[in-house]
């Protein structure tokens, strides 16, 4: 059986098994890694069965990161602060350790792309599991973060978790309109449905950078929209995916694989 796997719904699109196969090729570490389509009403049971059957590590993707948090026996500091986990490790005593590597994956990719400064004004769209993992690293980097979401009380609640850490606030979608941001990050799952979050076009100018945590072959719907509004610097989340995967591999095996060669390989495969 695969002793490592990514759990999500949907999951067939995931490039995580390919990423980890490339990590294995680099490191020589045995690491059988697969995909698991977890039912929306049976994620917890599916994950427990995986570990009971000999699973050693799991990655968690949408829409289960917050639910996975509650299944862990211990949490790393960043996992606890995020309130959501994307990585789980089975400990020698059988307990489950939860971590969140999304933030380090995002910040390292934004640094690689030169899209982030310590004083960047960041609009983070969405407050689900994907967003929860990146708020703290952005604040720790020195960014001013504004949250927005279809359900505004959820954004306000998340601000309450982090107001003591850095400069963070929330605005309802209907109050967005002026280009007050250096970077707009789409942390919603709208790309999976081929749609975009309901943002006003007036947010985008040529100087506003746009980043979509989602990725696909070619531009995502969000990036296509941002380019049409005039943004000159856009990127998808493939680099974030590889970065968080490398940190997951480190948690499981104590070895940090290279990110850039894997990213270049995946980008070439997606462009073929």
Swiss-Prot record:
> Which keywords, in A-to-Z order, does the entry hold?
Amino-acid biosynthesis, Aromatic amino acid biosynthesis, NADP, Oxidoreductase
Name residues in a coiled coil: none
Q: Which reaction does it catalyse?
A: shikimate + NADP(+) = 3-dehydroshikimate + NADPH + H(+)
Q: Name the positions where NADP(+) binds.
A: 77, 126-130, 149-154, 213, 237
Primary enzyme class: oxidoreductase
Q: What is its EC number?
A: 1.1.1.25
The UniProt annotation places shikimate binding at 14-16, 61, 86, 102, 215
What are the record's GO terms for cellular component?
cytosol
Question: What InterPro entries does this protein's entry cite?
Answer: Aminoacid_DH-like_N_sf, NAD(P)-bd_dom_sf, SDH_C, Shikimate_DH, Shikimate_DH-bd_N, Shikimate_DH_fam, Shikm_DH/Glu-tRNA_Rdtase
GO MF assignments: NADP binding; shikimate 3-dehydrogenase (NADP+) activity
SUPFAM superfamilies in the cross-refs: Aminoacid dehydrogenase-like, N-terminal domain (SSF53223), NAD(P)-binding Rossmann-fold domains (SSF51735)
**Pathway(s) where this gene product acts:** Metabolic intermediate biosynthesis; chorismate biosynthesis; chorismate from D-erythrose 4-phosphate and phosphoenolpyruvate: step 4/7
The active site is formed by 65
Q: One of this protein's GO BP terms?
A: chorismate biosynthetic process
Keyword presence, Protein transport: no
Q: Which one Pfam family would you cite for this protein?
A: SDH_C
Give the record's family classification: Belongs to the shikimate dehydrogenase family.
| Free-text function comment from the UniProt entry | Involved in the biosynthesis of the chorismate, which leads to the biosynthesis of aromatic amino acids. Catalyzes the reversible NADPH linked reduction of 3-dehydroshikimate (DHSA) to yield shikimate (SA).
Q: How does it assemble?
A: Homodimer.
This protein is called: Shikimate dehydrogenase (NADP(+))
| Origin species | Sodalis glossinidius (strain morsitans)
Q: Identify the coding gene.
A: aroE
């Amino acid at each position: 059986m695969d002793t490592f796997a990514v759990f999500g719904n949907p999951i067939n699109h995931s490039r995580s098994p390919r990423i980890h196969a490339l990590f294995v090729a680099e490191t020589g570490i045995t690491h059988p890694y697969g995909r698991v389509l977890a039912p929306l009403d049976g994620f917890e049971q599916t994950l427990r069965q995986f570990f009971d059957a000999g699973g050693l590590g799991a990655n968690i993707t949408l829409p289960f990161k917050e639910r996975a948090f509650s299944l862990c026996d211990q949490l790393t500091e960043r996992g606890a602060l995020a309130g959501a986990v994307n990585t789980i490790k089975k400990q020698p005593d059988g307990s489950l350790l939860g971590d969140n590597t999304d933030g380090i994956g995002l910040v390292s990719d934004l640094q690689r792309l030169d899209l982030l400064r310590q004083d960047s004004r960041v609009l983070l769209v969405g407050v689900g599991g994907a967003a929860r993992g990146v708020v703290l690293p952005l604040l720790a980097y020195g960014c001013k973060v504004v949250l927005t979401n279809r359900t505004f009380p959820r954004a306000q609640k998340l601000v309450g978790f982090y107001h003591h850490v850095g400069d963070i606030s929330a605005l309802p979608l209907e109050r967005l309109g002026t280009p007050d941001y250096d970077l707009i990050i789409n942390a919603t799952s709208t790309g999976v449905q081929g749609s975009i979050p309901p943002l006003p076009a007036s947010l985008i100018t040529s100087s506003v950078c746009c980043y979509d945590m989602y990725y696909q072959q070619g531009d995502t719907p969000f990036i296509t929209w941002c380019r049409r509004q005039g943004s000159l610097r856009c990127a998808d989340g493939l680099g974030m995916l590889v970065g968080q995967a490398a940190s997951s591999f480190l948690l499981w095996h104590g070895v940090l694989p290279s990110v850039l060669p894997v990213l270049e390989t995946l980008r070439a495969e997606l462009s073929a």
